[in-house]
Amino acid sequence: MDYQTFEKVNKFINVEAYIFFLTQELKQQYKLSLKELLILAYFYYKNEHSISLKEIIGDILYKQSDVVKNIKSLSKKGFINKSRNEADERRIFVSVTPIQRKKIACVINELDKIIKGFNKERDYIKYQWAPKYSKEFFILFMNIMYSKDFLKYRFNLTFLDLSILYVISSRKNEILNLKDLFESIRFMYPQIVRSVNRLNNKGMLIKERSLADERIVLIKINKIQYNTIKSIFTDTSKILKPRKFFF
Protein backbone atom coordinates (compact mmCIF):
# COMPACT_ATOMS: atom_id res chain seq x y z
CA MET A 1 0.00 0.00 0.00
CA ASP A 2 1.19 3.53 -0.78
CA TYR A 3 3.02 4.92 2.27
CA GLN A 4 1.47 8.39 2.06
CA THR A 5 -2.04 6.94 1.86
CA PHE A 6 -1.37 4.78 4.89
CA GLU A 7 0.04 7.75 6.83
CA LYS A 8 -3.01 9.91 6.03
CA VAL A 9 -5.34 7.25 7.39
CA ASN A 10 -3.11 6.86 10.45
CA LYS A 11 -3.26 10.62 11.05
CA PHE A 12 -7.04 10.53 10.69
CA ILE A 13 -7.20 7.86 13.42
CA ASN A 14 -4.81 9.79 15.69
CA VAL A 15 -6.72 13.06 15.28
CA GLU A 16 -10.04 11.36 16.07
CA ALA A 17 -8.51 9.85 19.22
CA TYR A 18 -7.20 13.29 20.20
CA ILE A 19 -10.67 14.81 19.85
CA PHE A 20 -12.20 11.95 21.83
CA PHE A 21 -9.82 12.28 24.78
CA LEU A 22 -9.93 16.09 24.81
CA THR A 23 -13.73 15.88 24.80
CA GLN A 24 -13.55 13.65 27.90
CA GLU A 25 -11.40 16.33 29.54
CA LEU A 26 -13.88 19.06 28.61
CA LYS A 27 -16.77 17.10 30.12
CA GLN A 28 -15.02 17.35 33.49
CA GLN A 29 -14.54 21.11 33.14
CA TYR A 30 -17.86 22.26 31.69
CA LYS A 31 -21.55 21.56 32.06
CA LEU A 32 -21.71 21.96 28.30
CA SER A 33 -21.62 19.35 25.55
CA LEU A 34 -19.14 19.54 22.68
CA LYS A 35 -22.02 20.47 20.37
CA GLU A 36 -22.97 23.35 22.67
CA LEU A 37 -19.36 24.53 22.79
CA LEU A 38 -19.24 24.41 18.98
CA ILE A 39 -22.29 26.70 18.76
CA LEU A 40 -20.76 29.11 21.29
CA ALA A 41 -17.52 29.14 19.28
CA TYR A 42 -19.62 29.77 16.18
CA PHE A 43 -21.05 32.97 17.68
CA TYR A 44 -17.70 33.99 19.16
CA TYR A 45 -15.80 33.78 15.87
CA LYS A 46 -18.62 34.95 13.59
CA ASN A 47 -18.90 38.02 15.83
CA GLU A 48 -22.42 38.87 14.66
CA HIS A 49 -25.30 40.08 16.82
CA SER A 50 -28.05 38.00 15.19
CA ILE A 51 -27.94 34.97 12.88
CA SER A 52 -30.82 33.04 11.34
CA LEU A 53 -31.31 29.43 12.42
CA LYS A 54 -31.21 28.44 8.74
CA GLU A 55 -27.73 29.94 8.35
CA ILE A 56 -26.45 28.23 11.51
CA ILE A 57 -27.71 24.84 10.32
CA GLY A 58 -26.05 25.44 6.94
CA ASP A 59 -22.71 26.23 8.59
CA ILE A 60 -22.61 23.51 11.25
CA LEU A 61 -22.30 19.85 10.28
CA TYR A 62 -25.16 18.57 12.39
CA LYS A 63 -28.70 17.66 11.46
CA GLN A 64 -31.35 20.29 12.09
CA SER A 65 -32.87 18.56 15.12
CA ASP A 66 -29.45 18.47 16.86
CA VAL A 67 -28.80 22.17 16.23
CA VAL A 68 -32.29 23.16 17.42
CA LYS A 69 -31.94 21.02 20.56
CA ASN A 70 -28.57 22.55 21.52
CA ILE A 71 -29.67 26.10 20.78
CA LYS A 72 -32.68 25.56 23.04
CA SER A 73 -30.37 24.26 25.79
CA LEU A 74 -27.96 27.22 25.45
CA SER A 75 -30.91 29.62 25.54
CA LYS A 76 -32.08 28.11 28.84
CA LYS A 77 -28.54 28.47 30.22
CA GLY A 78 -28.53 32.16 29.32
CA PHE A 79 -25.83 32.12 26.64
CA ILE A 80 -28.03 33.07 23.67
CA ASN A 81 -31.53 34.27 22.79
CA LYS A 82 -33.97 32.74 20.33
CA SER A 83 -36.75 34.71 18.64
CA ARG A 84 -39.09 34.58 15.64
CA ASN A 85 -39.12 37.10 12.83
CA GLU A 86 -42.10 39.47 13.20
CA ALA A 87 -42.79 39.55 9.45
CA ASP A 88 -42.49 35.78 9.04
CA GLU A 89 -42.84 33.64 12.16
CA ARG A 90 -41.42 30.61 10.35
CA ARG A 91 -38.00 32.31 10.42
CA ILE A 92 -36.11 31.87 13.68
CA PHE A 93 -33.16 34.05 14.68
CA VAL A 94 -30.54 33.49 17.37
CA SER A 95 -28.88 36.52 18.94
CA VAL A 96 -26.46 37.46 21.72
CA THR A 97 -26.37 40.56 23.91
CA PRO A 98 -23.09 42.32 24.85
CA ILE A 99 -23.27 40.69 28.29
CA GLN A 100 -23.81 37.26 26.76
CA ARG A 101 -20.93 37.85 24.37
CA LYS A 102 -18.64 38.47 27.34
CA LYS A 103 -19.94 35.29 28.96
CA ILE A 104 -19.20 33.33 25.77
CA ALA A 105 -15.74 34.93 25.52
CA CYS A 106 -14.92 33.70 29.03
CA VAL A 107 -15.84 30.13 28.02
CA ILE A 108 -13.75 30.28 24.83
CA ASN A 109 -10.74 31.82 26.60
CA GLU A 110 -10.90 29.10 29.25
CA LEU A 111 -11.18 26.49 26.51
CA ASP A 112 -7.99 27.84 24.92
CA LYS A 113 -6.17 27.33 28.24
CA ILE A 114 -7.50 23.78 28.61
CA ILE A 115 -6.36 22.87 25.08
CA LYS A 116 -2.89 24.28 25.74
CA GLY A 117 -2.60 22.38 29.04
CA PHE A 118 -3.96 19.16 27.52
CA ASN A 119 -1.45 19.28 24.66
CA LYS A 120 1.45 19.80 27.05
CA GLU A 121 0.32 17.14 29.53
CA ARG A 122 -0.31 14.49 26.85
CA ASP A 123 2.75 15.51 24.78
CA TYR A 124 0.65 16.48 21.74
CA ILE A 125 2.75 19.61 21.20
CA LYS A 126 5.13 17.50 19.09
CA TYR A 127 2.41 16.97 16.47
CA GLN A 128 2.07 19.64 13.81
CA TRP A 129 -1.66 18.96 13.43
CA ALA A 130 -2.45 19.47 17.14
CA PRO A 131 -4.65 22.58 17.60
CA LYS A 132 -3.17 25.43 19.62
CA TYR A 133 -6.48 27.03 20.53
CA SER A 134 -10.24 26.57 20.20
CA LYS A 135 -10.64 27.82 16.63
CA GLU A 136 -8.14 25.26 15.31
CA PHE A 137 -9.74 22.59 17.49
CA PHE A 138 -13.22 23.11 16.07
CA ILE A 139 -11.91 23.22 12.49
CA LEU A 140 -10.21 19.88 13.20
CA PHE A 141 -13.39 18.54 14.80
CA MET A 142 -15.59 19.51 11.85
CA ASN A 143 -13.14 17.98 9.38
CA ILE A 144 -13.32 14.73 11.33
CA MET A 145 -17.13 14.88 11.28
CA TYR A 146 -17.06 15.39 7.51
CA SER A 147 -14.71 12.43 7.05
CA LYS A 148 -16.85 10.16 9.23
CA ASP A 149 -19.90 11.04 7.17
CA PHE A 150 -17.93 10.18 4.02
CA LEU A 151 -17.12 6.73 5.43
CA LYS A 152 -20.73 6.15 6.37
CA TYR A 153 -22.35 7.16 3.10
CA ARG A 154 -19.65 6.05 0.65
CA PHE A 155 -18.62 2.71 2.15
CA ASN A 156 -21.20 2.04 4.88
CA LEU A 157 -18.35 1.91 7.40
CA THR A 158 -18.03 3.37 10.88
CA PHE A 159 -14.87 5.00 12.15
CA LEU A 160 -14.29 1.93 14.34
CA ASP A 161 -14.55 -0.29 11.25
CA LEU A 162 -11.86 1.80 9.57
CA SER A 163 -9.63 1.63 12.66
CA ILE A 164 -9.85 -2.16 12.73
CA LEU A 165 -9.10 -2.43 9.01
CA TYR A 166 -6.10 -0.15 9.54
CA VAL A 167 -4.64 -2.33 12.30
CA ILE A 168 -5.21 -5.54 10.34
CA SER A 169 -3.80 -4.19 7.06
CA SER A 170 -0.74 -2.75 8.83
CA ARG A 171 -0.01 -6.28 10.09
CA LYS A 172 -1.38 -8.20 7.11
CA ASN A 173 1.13 -11.02 7.41
CA GLU A 174 0.05 -11.77 10.97
CA ILE A 175 -2.98 -13.54 12.41
CA LEU A 176 -4.36 -11.24 15.09
CA ASN A 177 -6.82 -11.79 17.92
CA LEU A 178 -9.34 -9.49 19.58
CA LYS A 179 -6.83 -8.59 22.29
CA ASP A 180 -4.45 -7.22 19.65
CA LEU A 181 -7.21 -4.92 18.39
CA PHE A 182 -8.21 -3.84 21.89
CA GLU A 183 -4.61 -2.85 22.66
CA SER A 184 -4.26 -0.91 19.39
CA ILE A 185 -7.38 1.30 19.29
CA ARG A 186 -9.30 3.41 21.80
CA PHE A 187 -12.66 1.61 21.65
CA MET A 188 -14.13 -0.71 24.28
CA TYR A 189 -13.98 -4.49 23.89
CA PRO A 190 -17.74 -5.04 23.20
CA GLN A 191 -17.65 -2.34 20.51
CA ILE A 192 -14.68 -4.02 18.85
CA VAL A 193 -16.40 -7.42 18.92
CA ARG A 194 -19.52 -6.02 17.24
CA SER A 195 -17.45 -4.27 14.58
CA VAL A 196 -15.41 -7.41 13.85
CA ASN A 197 -18.63 -9.41 13.47
CA ARG A 198 -20.03 -6.77 11.12
CA LEU A 199 -16.87 -6.70 8.99
CA ASN A 200 -16.80 -10.50 8.92
CA ASN A 201 -20.41 -10.60 7.71
CA LYS A 202 -19.53 -8.08 4.98
CA GLY A 203 -16.63 -10.27 3.86
CA MET A 204 -13.97 -7.66 4.67
CA LEU A 205 -12.05 -9.87 7.08
CA ILE A 206 -11.92 -13.49 8.21
CA LYS A 207 -12.88 -14.41 11.77
CA GLU A 208 -12.29 -17.91 13.08
CA ARG A 209 -11.77 -19.80 16.32
CA SER A 210 -8.30 -20.97 17.31
CA LEU A 211 -7.88 -24.74 16.98
CA ALA A 212 -5.65 -24.75 20.04
CA ASP A 213 -8.12 -22.79 22.20
CA GLU A 214 -11.66 -22.17 20.95
CA ARG A 215 -12.05 -19.25 23.37
CA ILE A 216 -9.59 -17.26 21.24
CA VAL A 217 -10.97 -15.50 18.16
CA LEU A 218 -8.43 -15.08 15.35
CA ILE A 219 -8.67 -12.37 12.68
CA LYS A 220 -6.92 -12.19 9.33
CA ILE A 221 -7.39 -10.99 5.74
CA ASN A 222 -6.66 -12.52 2.37
CA LYS A 223 -5.19 -10.82 -0.69
CA ILE A 224 -8.58 -9.85 -2.15
CA GLN A 225 -9.67 -8.31 1.15
CA TYR A 226 -6.37 -6.45 1.43
CA ASN A 227 -6.88 -4.95 -2.03
CA THR A 228 -10.41 -3.88 -1.07
CA ILE A 229 -9.08 -2.18 2.07
CA LYS A 230 -6.36 -0.53 0.00
CA SER A 231 -9.00 0.91 -2.33
CA ILE A 232 -11.04 2.24 0.61
CA PHE A 233 -7.97 3.86 2.15
CA THR A 234 -7.01 5.46 -1.17
CA ASP A 235 -10.47 7.01 -1.61
CA THR A 236 -10.64 8.09 2.04
CA SER A 237 -7.20 9.73 1.96
CA LYS A 238 -8.33 11.96 -0.92
CA ILE A 239 -10.99 13.66 1.22
CA LEU A 240 -8.83 14.09 4.33
CA LYS A 241 -7.41 17.43 3.23
CA PRO A 242 -8.43 20.30 5.57
CA ARG A 243 -11.65 22.09 4.63
CA LYS A 244 -12.69 25.63 5.36
CA PHE A 245 -15.85 26.02 7.37
CA PHE A 246 -17.60 29.02 8.95
CA PHE A 247 -14.55 30.22 10.91
From Swiss-Prot:
Belongs to the SarA family. One of its GO terms (cellular component) is cytoplasm. The gene is sarU. Gene3D superfamilies: Winged helix-like DNA-binding domain superfamily/Winged helix DNA-binding domain. It is found in: Cytoplasm. Residues 53-76, 178-201 bind DNA. Its main location: cytoplasm. This is HTH-type transcriptional regulator SarU. InterPro entries: MarR/SlyA-like (IPR039422), SarA/Rot_dom (IPR010166), Transc_reg_Sar_Rot_HTH (IPR055166), WH-like_DNA-bd_sf (IPR036388), WH_DNA-bd_sf (IPR036390). GO terms for biological process: regulation of DNA-templated transcription; response to stress. Positive regulator of RNAII and RNAIII in a cell density-dependent manner. It can contribute to the expression of virulence genes controlled by agr. May also regulate target genes via an agr-independent pathway. Induction: Maximally expressed during post-exponential growth phase. Repressed by SarT.
